[in-house]
């Protein structure tokens, strides 16, 4: 694959606690994601799955190792610079949607675009197009509490890619949904990632859904291991 490297994690180590409470989570984890590639992270709870995603998304610092986003080393960067890279290059989807309850679905998707400085009319147009792509264009004026769980998560996915990030990270994005809804949301997420040409790392417990991805990896003894 000749696509450019969007995200590279090298020798990532992360532990919590000190002394008697010392708990190593990641022990020299390596992972490379290329543009247009979808990768499923299939690992049990407690193995460091969320920690790896948080480090990849610049939400957490590793104790050792290097994180490169689009070729830029994020080690030693100021918090402001890390925040700028995260906003411009990375979209994040959580198991729980974290939508702003006082705003409509359309406004929630517009929000990151407005923060990035996009004119309101352009932000609204892109938000509307994303809602249409996720097949919930007719729900744009509804607030999160008026949406089903699947609809809420589709809005969250649209919000995550609103600024056309290079990388999409998702931590159990369908874990709180029924199997049928989870399947549709996961397929929509995977299709959106492919169409946008971004690099996607999606954590899931569901091996059937993970099989839709280009690659599957897991975490064993603190290291990222490729699954066949």
Swiss-Prot record:
Entry-linked CDD domains: ABC_MJ0796_LolCDE_FtsE (cd03255)
BP-aspect Gene Ontology terms: lipoprotein localization to outer membrane; protein localization to outer membrane
Residues where ATP binds: 43-50
A GO CC term assigned to this protein in UniProt: plasma membrane
Ranges for domain ABC transporter: 7-227
Top-level taxon of origin: Bacteria
One function term, GO molecular function aspect: ATP binding
Root EC class: translocase
Topological type in the membrane: Peripheral membrane protein
Keywords recorded for this protein, A-Z: ATP-binding, Cell inner membrane, Cell membrane, Membrane, Nucleotide-binding, Translocase, Transport
Assembly notes: The complex is composed of two ATP-binding proteins (LolD) and two transmembrane proteins (LolC and LolE).
Function according to Swiss-Prot or TrEMBL: Part of the ABC transporter complex LolCDE involved in the translocation of mature outer membrane-directed lipoproteins, from the inner membrane to the periplasmic chaperone, LolA. Responsible for the formation of the LolA-lipoprotein complex in an ATP-dependent manner.
Protein name per UniProt: Lipoprotein-releasing system ATP-binding protein LolD
Taxonomic source organism: Rhizobium meliloti (strain 1021)
């Amino acid at each position: 694959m000749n696509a450019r490297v969007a995200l590279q994690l090298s020798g990532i180590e992360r532990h919590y606690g000190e002394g008697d409470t010392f708990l190593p989570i990641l022990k020299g984890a390596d992972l490379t994601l290329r543009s247009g590639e979808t990768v499923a992270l299939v690992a049990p709870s407690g193995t460091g799955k969320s920690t790896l995603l948080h480090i990849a998304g610049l939400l957490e610092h590793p104790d050792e190792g290097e994180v490169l986003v689009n070729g830029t080393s994020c080690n030693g960067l100021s918090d402001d610079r890390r925040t700028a890279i995260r906003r411009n290059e990375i979209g994040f989807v959580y198991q729980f949607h974290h939508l702003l309850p006082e705003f409509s679905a359309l406004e929630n998707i517009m929000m990151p675009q407005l923060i990035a400085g996009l004119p309101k009319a352009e932000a609204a147009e892109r938000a509307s197009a994303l809602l249409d792509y996720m097949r919930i264009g007719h729900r744009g004026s509804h607030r999160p509490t008026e949406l089903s769980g699947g609809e809420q998560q589709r809005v969250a996915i649209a919000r995550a890619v609103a600024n056309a990030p290079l990388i999409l990270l998702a931590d159990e994005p369908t874990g709180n949904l029924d199997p049928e809804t989870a399947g549709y949301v996961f397929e929509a997420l995977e299709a959106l990632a492919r169409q946008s040409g971004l690099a996607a790392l999606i954590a899931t417990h569901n091996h059937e859904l993970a099989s839709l991805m280009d690659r599957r990896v897991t975490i064993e003894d603190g290291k990222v291991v490729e699954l066949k």
